[in-house]
């Protein structure tokens, strides 16, 4: 028999679970201020719950959108100017919703990075 292959861990691939957990602990103080009475659960879960019970909707239909900043992040990195990236991200998603006639109720996020420095 040959030697046993070593299992690859998250840490081996550059993922620092501890740093990620520390980052998630800091988010509620910022994000919770955006919640309204319809948000059922908070940050850190893998899915979110939003109640339509308090909405006055005659024909309820949920519309979701998820968009990224695309190549604009490359320009931000090259110029070291990140000031508009977050605003642009939110604006692009809201624009995708309102052009359908939908009312923005919540924001879906996706955070991706090569290394988390907190």
Specify the residue positions occupied by each region the protein language model found.
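N-terminal amphipathic/basic leader segments beginning at the initiator methionine
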Residues: 2-38
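Glycine-rich phosphate/pyrophosphate-binding loop regions near the starts of catalytic domains
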Residues: 29, 35-118
């Amino acid at each position: 028999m040959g030697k046993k292959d070593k299992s690859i861990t998250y840490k081996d691939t550059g993922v620092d679970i501890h740093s990620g957990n520390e980052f998630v602990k800091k988010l509620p103080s910022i994000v919770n201020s955006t919640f309204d009475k319809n948000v059922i659960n908070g940050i850190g879960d893998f899915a979110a719950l939003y109640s339509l019970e308090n909405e006055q909707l005659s024909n309820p239909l949920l519309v979701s959108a998820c968009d990224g900043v695309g190549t604009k992040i490359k320009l931000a990195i090259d110029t070291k100017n990140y000031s508009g990236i977050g605003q642009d991200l939110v604006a692009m998603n809201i624009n995708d919703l309102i052009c359908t006639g939908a009312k923005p109720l919540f924001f879906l996020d996706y955070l991706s990075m090569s290394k988390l420095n907190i």
